[in-house]
C-alpha cells in the first residue's frame, strides 16, 4: 500500500475516532433520536466467516424480521461518519417490522475504528439482543485469509500470518472469541448475548434457529424459514474472490505458533459459556 493511501486511511480513521468520541460524549444524541423508529433492535455481531450472512439471510425470511439493506453496514465503526440518516435508511421500507437487525461482523474486531463499538452500540441502542456466531478458530482463520486475499491486492501470503501486523490484527485476532466476548460483557449483561457455533447451526439448523427466534422474542417456528430444513449453501458476496484463492496450507511451525496464541483464549471462551472442552479439536 502506498504511503499516500496509508496517510489517507490514517486521516479517515482519525476523523472517525473523533466522531465516535463526540458521540460517546452525548453530542450526537439529538441527531440519533430523530431516527429512533428505524434503529435496529438486534445485531449479529460476528464472527467473520462464520456463516453470519447465511444466518441473517434466513432470519430475513421471517415476516416480522427486517435485515438492513446492506447486511454489514459497519455503522458502529468505520462508517459512523456517514451519519444517522444513512443508517436509518438501511431499515427504511413500507412495512414496519417488529424486529430489525444487521450483521456487521467487524463489530467483534477491535481493529482501528472498531475499538469502541460495544460502548457505542450500548450508548445509542441500549441493551438489545446480540448474536455471536463462532466457528472453529483455525477454520475461521483459513476462510478469512482466503476472503481477504481474494479482495485485497496487497494481502500478505498465508505463511506471513503472524509476521504481518495487518494479518495478525485483522485475521488472527478475530478468532480470539473470549477477548471479543468480554469487550461486550463490559457493556451488556450475559443474558443479552446469545452465542452459538457455526458447526451446531449447520448440524441442527431448525433447533438452532428456534433457539434464536425464542431469544429474539418470537415463536420458535423455524421450519418455515428453511427449504427442506436446510440452510442456504451459497454466499455469493462472501465467496467472491475466495473461490479463486486456494485453501491455505499450514506448516507445522505456523500451526503450532497460531494455536499457542488462540487455544488459551478458546479454552476461556468455552469455560465461560460452560460448553464442552472438546467443542473444537486442534489436531
Feature locations, PLM:
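Surface-exposed cleft-lining segments at the edges of enzyme active sites
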Residues: 103-111, 160-172, 245-256
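Generic structural signal for small/hydrophobic residues in well-ordered secondary structure
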Residues: 51-52, 101, 121, 130, ...
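The conserved 3'-phosphoadenosine-5'-phosphosulfate
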Residues: 172, 182-267, 275-283
Amino acid at each position: 500500500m502506498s504511503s499516500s493511501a496509508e496517510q489517507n486511511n490514517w486521516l479517515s480513521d482519525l476523523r472517525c475516532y473523533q466522531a465516535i468520541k463526540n458521540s460517546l460524549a452525548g453530542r450526537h444524541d439529538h441527531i440519533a433520536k430523530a431516527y429512533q423508529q428505524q434503529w435496529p433492535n438486534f445485531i449479529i455481531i460476528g464472527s467473520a466467516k462464520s456463516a453470519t450472512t447465511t444466518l441473517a439471510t434466513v432470519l430475513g425470511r421471517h415476516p416480522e424480521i427486517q435485515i438492513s439493506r446492506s447486511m454489514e453496514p459497519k455503522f458502529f465503526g468505520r462508517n459512523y461518519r456517514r451519519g444517522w440518516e444513512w443508517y436509518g435508511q438501511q431499515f427504511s421500507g413500507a412495512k414496519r417490522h417488529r424486529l430489525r437487525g444487521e450483521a456487521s461482523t467487524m463489530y467483534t474486531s477491535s481493529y482501528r475504528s472498531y475499538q469502541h463499538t460495544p460502548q457505542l452500540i450500548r450508548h445509542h441502542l441500549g441493551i438489545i439482543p446480540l448474536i455471536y456466531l463462532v466457528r472453529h478458530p483455525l477454520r475461521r482463520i483459513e476462510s478469512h485469509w482466503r476472503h481477504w486475499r481474494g479482495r485485497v491486492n496487497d494481502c500478505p501470503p498465508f505463511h506471513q500470518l503472524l509476521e504481518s501486523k495487518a494479518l495478525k490484527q485483522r485475521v488472527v485476532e478475530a478468532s480470539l472469541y473470549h477477548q471479543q466476548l468480554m469487550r461486550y460483557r463490559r457493556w451488556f449483561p450475559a443474558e443479552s448475548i446469545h452465542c452459538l457455533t457455526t458447526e451446531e447451526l449447520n448440524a441442527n439448523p431448525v433447533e438452532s434457529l428456534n433457539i434464536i427466534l425464542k431469544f429474539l422474542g418470537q415463536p420458535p417456528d423455524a421450519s418455515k424459514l428453511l427449504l427442506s430444513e436446510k440452510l442456504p449453501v451459497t454466499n455469493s458476496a462472501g465467496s467472491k474472490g475466495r473461490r479463486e484463492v486456494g485453501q491455505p496450507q499450514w506448516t507445522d511451525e505456523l500451526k503450532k505458533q497460531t494455536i499457542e496464541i488462540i487455544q488459551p483464549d478458546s479454552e476461556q471462551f468455552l469455560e465461560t459459556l460452560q460448553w464442552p472442552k472438546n467443542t473444537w479439536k486442534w489436531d
